[in-house]
Amino acid sequence: GILAAVGVVAYNGYTNSAKSSNIKSTCKSIEKFIRLETMKCNTGMTDYIFDQTNSLNFLCPLRVQNPGRIAKNAFINYVGYSRCSFCTMKNPFKQEKSLVVFNNWGTINDNHLGYVFISDNNTGIDLYCCHTTPCKDSANHTRLNIIP
């Protein structure tokens, strides 16, 4: 009885910790990937950002008025048409939901747990991930802007 109850609580704590670690790691991997691809674009190592050859807007280096929006749109295409490691991943806290969300996160709240939000602010790609509740606690989320 008591040992079983303690075991369930300990197991749930362990699985939540593993899910949080998964989100932290995945968020960091996506950040590194975006930084690498934008660097390749800006240094002439590739002709199109995220290899999205379907639009001249994605031609490297990004010489458009809103490079963040263009880079985000190319990334949306990349995730939508690719078989990358994180493209088909699910939110570990809500298995029926996709991991990556292309939307501004608005007011930070606990419904963001387990998602990787990708947005833009015209100059860069905004990345936001909540790995632990409460999400509004700065220690529980990653929020950054990647300038292409």
Where are these predicted regions, by residue range?
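Amphipathic alpha-helical segments typified by the pilin-like N-terminal helix
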Residues: 1-29
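N-terminal alpha-helical signal peptides/signal-anchor transmembrane segments
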Residues: 26-45
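Periplasmic/extracellular, small/polar-rich flexible segments of pilin-like filament-forming proteins
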Residues: 39-148
